[in-house]
Regions:
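Active-site loop/oxyanion-hole signature of alpha/beta-hydrolase fold enzymes
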Residues: 41-78
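Flexible "cap/lid" loop of the alpha/beta hydrolase fold
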Residues: 94-131
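Gly/Ala-rich beta-loop-alpha elbow adjacent to hydrolase catalytic centers
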Residues: 80-85, 89
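Active-site signature of alpha/beta-hydrolase-fold catalytic machinery across serine-
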Residues: 29, 91-95
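Structural motif
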Residues: 12-13, 78, 102
């Protein structure tokens, strides 16, 4: 796992969990805005870290906890999580001993989807991801309803 921070370590802490397909850097615009008042912590999952191997959700949480402890964080004023990052954040929230002020989930995937529906959706998701790759981001607007060039680097390597 890789961690990037913004702000003063002595200020109230804000922890971000990124969405699938992006890194912790996707939260930098918000962290830049907050850094004068908050200590912003942007972890990047091991899945996106060169030379690291994803082990488990529990291991990701262990790494976040260890980092927070190493930075002297005893309380989180805010936890922000997007999309699949909300799943990791929920696991973090249910296991951490840290005090949490507020939580904000953006597009968390908490629906219980049956096996049959998942099997039907998988080929479509696969094609959507492949089309992003093949078109070098050209289909981004069709998939995410946006085509802002400033966000393409977070989706297209």
């Amino acid at each position: 796992m890789k961690f990037k921070t913004f702000g003063n370590r002595n200020d109230p802490a804000v922890l971000f969990f990124h969405a699938m397909g992006v890194t912790g850097e996707s939260s930098e615009p918000v962290a830049n805005y907050l850094q004068d008042r908050y200590f912003c912590i942007l972890p990047t999952s091991t899945v996106y870290c060169k030379g690291q191997k994803y082990v488990s959700k529990a291991d990701e949480i262990r790494q976040v906890e260890a980092y927070l402890k190493s930075q002297g964080v005893e309380r989180l004023e805010l936890v922000v999580a997007s999309s699949i990052g909300a799943d990791l954040a929920m696991a973090f929230l249910t296991s951490t001993k840290l005090s949490i002020g507020h939580v904000f989930f953006d597009g968390g995937q908490f629906a219980q989807i049956g096996k049959g529906t998942r099997r039907m959706m998988t080929p479509f998701l696969y094609l959507a991801i492949k089309s992003l790759y093949w078109s070098k981001g050209g289909t981004l607007k069709k998939i995410l309803w946006c085509d802002d060039d400033s966000i393409k680097p977070y989706f297209i390597a």
